[in-house]
Amino acid sequence: MALIKTYEHLIALRTLVGVFEAGFAPGILLMLSSWYKKHEQSKRFAVYISAAVLSGAFGGIIAGAITGGMEGTAGLRGWRWLFVGLHRSLLASWLLMLTLSQIIEGAATCVWALVAFFLLPDYPANTKRLSEQERELAVSRLEDDQGHGQTEETAHISSIQALTQSVRSWKVWIMIAGYMVIVGSSTLSYFYPTLVAGLGYSAVKAQFMVVPIYAVAFVCVGVTGYFGDKYPKVRGLIISGWLVVSLTCAIVICVVYGYSARYALLVIMAAGLWSTNGCALSYAASTFGDMPRETRAVSLALVNALGNLAQIYGAYLFPEKDQPKYLLGFGVIAGMCAFGVFVYALAHILFRKYIRT
């Protein structure tokens, strides 16, 4: 992408990037769920999600610094320095910087992929990083937790069999429905600067005011991960509780006119939505723990892939014409959160009944 010159080429390459990166998130989910017990997974998934939260916080700081510090430089508004090709006299230098940036980012990704290939262990049953005794211990601790453990002698099933078992599992579809709600509501994060600017802040200050939103969310994600592992049998209720918080904030923010109050509600709502994400993934992974490894891999991939389809419609929830109240967007999020409360409360009841029987 560093060298392309047309929109069509950009779309084609972005599609390829999506194809090549499609296995990353499901792979992370499978890796974590393959090594840790059910009551150990929420904290690990929280660390995984917190990386995205931190990137949002640093992104706000960088955008604010550039927007404010570069204001008027070379005759350009500060926000224009966040983009490329907006001034003919600077086009060549900006294209060079963009090219170098993309090359560096791409090269760093490739280098880290090679490092990860040697650093990341395989499954507990066949990793060469552990001794025979350590492998037996790793498998036995998972067997004690999940009721079974897969060794090298365990019969494998085909990809078609795994897919068939996955799509026939009612547990998978409950988790897909719940995760679609969370991802769809979490597209709110795309509009943080726009929403904050609508509360009366300048464009520069709006970028910096996004940082506390992510900072509070970062803390809440960690706390939720801790309690998700401390009380693993009520993860569904923990998720439902956070969705109730976000639902309440989404409703109240539609009728509150004070800028400070709306900002505080936005912070709390964002914290609730981010906190449900990691907990929902660990809930799904632990729920699928009794499945064969191949089926669990497909099931986690389906939850991640179908759940993220919600980003398609989520990107249209806050059109410019709805500012500054954005009643449509917050109303839809409130509705999705309400449905999510029902889904995860139902999941809690059904899964506990399934375990007892």
Model features per residue range: what roles?
Residues 1-11, 19, 33-43, 50-87, ...:
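Extracellular/lumenal inter-transmembrane loop segments of multi-pass membrane transporters
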Residues 2, 6, 18-26, 35, ...:
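Small-residue-rich segments within alpha-helical transmembrane domains of MFS-like 12-TM solute carriers
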Residues 9-23, 31, 261-279, 283, ...:
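Hydrophobic core of transmembrane alpha-helices in multi-pass small-molecule transporters
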Residues 38-52, 72-163, 328, 334-357:
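Central mid-sequence intracellular linker of multi-pass
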Residues 47-52, 178, 298-306:
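Hydrophobic alpha-helical segments of secondary membrane carriers
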Residues 52, 209-217, 303, 307:
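Transmembrane alpha-helical segments of major facilitator superfamily
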Residues 161-226, 236, 281, 312-315:
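Extracytoplasmic gate region of multi-pass secondary transporters
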Residues 236-252:
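Structural signature of the two symmetry-related core transmembrane helices
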